[in-house]
C-alpha cells in the first residue's frame, strides 16, 4: 500500500459488526486519544499519531481484496478506536468540561494534521509499530516481549525515566 494522505479506510465496529468507511485522518483522530490520554504533551500525541498511521498502513497491507474491513476498533486485534461522538461522551461522563473537551480535540487534531505525511519505514517497508506508554529505565527487545522474530529497529535501549514522561 502506498501512503496517501486522504486515504479512505473501512473500520469494523466490534460491538455491532458495522463497517464504516472514513478518511484515515478521522480514524487516527479516534485512535490517538484511545491509545494515549489526550492530556499528554503534544509531542507525545504527535509520536502516537505517526506510530498509529504506520501501524494502520502495515496492517492494511496484510488484508486481501475480499476483506470486509481494513481495521477494527478492538485493541487486541488492531488499535483502540472510538469515533468523535463516543470520545466526547466518554469525556463528559468523566466530568470533563466542554472547554477541556474542545482543548483535547484541538490537540489531537493538531497531532494528526501536523504529522500528516509522516510514517516510519525500515529498508523501504512500514515497520511493525509496536508501542507502549512508559518503560522504566530500559526498553526490551521485541522478541523478548512478543516472541517471534528479532527486529533490528526494535531493540533494547537505556531510558532515563523522568516523572514528566507525558
Question: How would you label these PLM feature ranges?
Answer:
Residues 1-166:
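Conserved, single-site charged/polar hotspot
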Amino acid at each position: 500500500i502506498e501512503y496517501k494522505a486522504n486515504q479512505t479506510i473501512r473500520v469494523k465496529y466490534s460491538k455491532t459488526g458495522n463497517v464504516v468507511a472514513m478518511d484515515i485522518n478521522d480514524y487516527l483522530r479516534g485512535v490517538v486519544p484511545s491509545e494515549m490520554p489526550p492530556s499528554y504533551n503534544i509531542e507525545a500525541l504527535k509520536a502516537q499519531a505517526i506510530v498509529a498511521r504506520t501501524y494502520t498502513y502495515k496492517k492494511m497491507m496484510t488484508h486481501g481484496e475480499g476483506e470486509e474491513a481494513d481495521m477494527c476498533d478492538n485493541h487486541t486485534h488492531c488499535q483502540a478506536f472510538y469515533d468523535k461522538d463516543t470520545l466526547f461522551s466518554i469525556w463528559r461522563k468523566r466530568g470533563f468540561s466542554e472547554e477541556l473537551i474542545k482543548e483535547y480535540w484541538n490537540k489531537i487534531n493538531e497531532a494528526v494534521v501536523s504529522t500528516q505525511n509522516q510514517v516510519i519505514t525500515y529498508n523501504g517497508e512500514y515497520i511493525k509499530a509496536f508501542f507502549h506508554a512508559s518503560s522504566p529505565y530500559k526498553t526490551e527487545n521485541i522478541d523478548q516481549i512478543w516472541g517471534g522474530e528479532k527486529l533490528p529497529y526494535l531493540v533494547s535501549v537505556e531510558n532515563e525515566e523522568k516523572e514528566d514522561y507525558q
